[in-house]
């Protein structure tokens, strides 16, 4: 199996692309079903990790939507610091809106917890997390 070296780390393929694409399709199908007929939801991607996932996901969404991104920092290298900082915040109006946070993976849960608290303080109609 081919390995890729990035800086001082070696990586090998864990999940083939086809399985990832299938999973994204299943997630999109569920979102399409759950949000059919609702007012335009706001998808909020957590950079940098969610960028490609969100791109592939949005291509499969069958209703009008709005996109935004935030950038958070909670790591020093590959280690969690336990402290989440907003580098790029959410500037969109949230009150009364359906919001879907898009994250590539949930590791410690600290970034997602930070996002949920920030959204709840802004009174969305609903809030959900979509993660690969």
Stretches with model-predicted labels:
Residues 1-132:
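PRPP-associated nucleotide enzymes
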């Amino acid at each position: 199996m081919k390995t890729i070296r990035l800086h001082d780390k070696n990586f090998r393929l864990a999940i083939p692309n086809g399985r990832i694409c299938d999973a994204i399709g299943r997630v999109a199908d569920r979102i399409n079903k759950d949000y059919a007929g609702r007012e335009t939801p706001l998808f909020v991607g957590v950079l940098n990790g969610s960028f490609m996932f969100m791109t592939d996901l949005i291509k499969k969404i069958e209703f009008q939507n709005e996109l935004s991104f935030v950038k958070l920092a909670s790591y020093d290298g590959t280690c969690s610091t336990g402290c989440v900082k907003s580098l790029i915040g959410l500037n969109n109006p949230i009150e009364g809106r359906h919001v879907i946070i898009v994250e590539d993976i949930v590791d410690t849960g600290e970034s997602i917890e930070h996002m949920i608290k920030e959204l709840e303080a802004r009174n969305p109609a609903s809030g959900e997390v979509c993660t690969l």
